[in-house]
Amino acid sequence: EIFSAGHEIACHTHRHVPLDQQTPEEFRDDLRRNMDGLYKAGVEKLNGFRAPIFSLTKKTQWAYDILIEQGFTYSSSVLPAVNPLYGWPEFGAAFRRMHDRIWELPITLFPWRFFSVPCAGGLYFRTLPLWMTTRAFRHHWDQSQPVLSYFHPYDIDTEQEYFMHPGLKDNRFYNWVMYQNRGTMLDK
């Protein structure tokens, strides 16, 4: 149903471990495992990738070479702002060609007076008030800019079993936040 409705399925790794907690070889193996599962599920072509927890940063740019090697054409893995976990503020909000072969499409931000906040997917979409998300979307549309959004199955599926995200280093607060407001998603 997802494919026939015109939606794209992108790759997000199998184990959801941040890039800086893996070697390039571990990342390649984890990526391949996820790709194989998606192909078995009926995905015909994988073009897009998003790193767990937006962990593609200045220090983990080696991942672009592996993404290119595996045939990806774009990544939406950079959070171009300061964040308690990951972020690459100096990257900027513009789409950029990386390593001459793959596009990086940074996550959509809501520009506040003194800082910017991610607003268009997953945790941010679930926890921010709807007025803020709507205002952010309108801001981008008024400037003819796209809004990039994403959702995990657990963002919508309130029946999915609770689990500790490996990339959050067993931090109970961050893991608690990951499950907040799941019941509000479909209404939004």
Cite the ranges covered by each PLM segment.
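Catalytic alpha-helical scaffold of carbohydrate-active enzymes acting on polysaccharides/glycoconjugates
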Residues: 1-48, 53-113, 129-188
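Surface-exposed cleft-lining segments at the edges of enzyme active sites
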Residues: 117-127
